[in-house]
Each structure stands twice: as C-alpha cells, then as structure tokens.
C-alpha cells in the first residue's frame, strides 16, 4: 500500500526517500509549521512486535539525546491511526555513498568531510551513544558541503569504556570496524 498522499497526524506524505531494516523514510510536509520533514515509518508487521516497537522508541530517545550540527535532528516520535513514526530533519543532498560512486573525492574535501564525521561521532560518544551502522549510505552531504550523520537505528547506549559491545546482531557488521 502506497503512503504517498496520505496524512499521518499533521504530516502529508510527499515522496519516498529510502527503505531500511527498521522502516521506510518519506519526505513529508508538516502542515502546521509549513516545513518539509522526513518521516520514518515503522512497518505494520513490526508494529505488532513489542521488541521492534521498543527498539524504534529507543532509537528516538537516543537521537533526541544528541544535539549536534553534524547529526540529523529528531523532531518527534508519533503515532497516528496505529502507525508509529519518527519525525526527522529533512537533509537535502547526496549520501556520501552517492558521491563516492561519482568518482574520487579530492583530498582537501575528503579531509573536511572526515573532520565533520569525526565531530558528529565524538558528540554522540560524549553522550554515551555508539552509532554501530556508520557507512557512506548513512551520511548525507548537503549542497553546502555540510555532513549530517543519519540513521541511529542500531545505535547503542553504553555506560563507559569497560562495557563490552555486542555487535553480532548488526546487519552491516562489516562496517562496524570503522567506528572502533
């Protein structure tokens, strides 16, 4: 069933953005505030699974604990007509994966991008959050060259350096090494 044209609370779904392990992401219009947002919808089959709903809510809380210019912001955790969804900052631009496919990124630009990614991860780590799925597809580069790290769906809160991390349930375990 297509979500395009449907309204969830005050958000009118405009277009698909992408699909991941924990849901679909759409561009939407916040009809109260008049701004474009991203809506991450928990699939109907997951909404019946208490563990998946809890994980979705945990993602929202972890993301809400982060406030950094290089991390995509969350505006809310909502439910409308039995549909659970996150309201997120809409980040325009290509993913880093898209930019890499176009060809080599000049060294000077690569250093600027890497610095911004490191700052985002440092801010998350200072709040006790490890992304666990950092990869070029989860990093947006705005037209102005600003990095936004997205998709904290597999993020884990940790108590400190002594805690052992269990990455065995990560669907993109091969990307985990970049975060260690």
What spans do the regions from the language model cover?
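Conserved ATP-binding/catalytic core of the eukaryotic-like protein kinase fold
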Residues: 1-180
């Amino acid at each position: 069933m297509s979500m395009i044209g449907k309204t969830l609370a005050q958000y009118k779904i405009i277009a698909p953005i992408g699909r991941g392990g924990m849901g679909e992401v759409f561009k939407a219009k916040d009809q109260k505030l008049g701004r474009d947002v991203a809506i991450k919808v928990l699939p109907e089959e997951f909404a019946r699974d208490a563990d998946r709903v809890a994980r979705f809510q945990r993602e929202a809380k972890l993301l809400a604990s982060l406030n950094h210019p290089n991390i995509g912001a969350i505006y809310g955790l909502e439910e409308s007509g039995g549909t659970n969804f996150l309201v997120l900052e809409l980040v325009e631009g290509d993913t880093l994966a898209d930019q890499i496919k176009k060809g080599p990124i000049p060294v000077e630009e690569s250093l600027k991008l890497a610095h911004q990614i490191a700052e985002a991860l440092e801010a998350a780590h200072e709040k006790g959050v490890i992304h666990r799925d950092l990869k070029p597809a989860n990093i947006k580069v705005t037209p102005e060259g600003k990095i936004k790290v997205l998709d904290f769906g597999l993020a884990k809160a940790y108590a400190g350096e002594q805690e052992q991390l269990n990455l065995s349930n990560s669907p993109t375990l091969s990307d985990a090494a970049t975060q260690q």
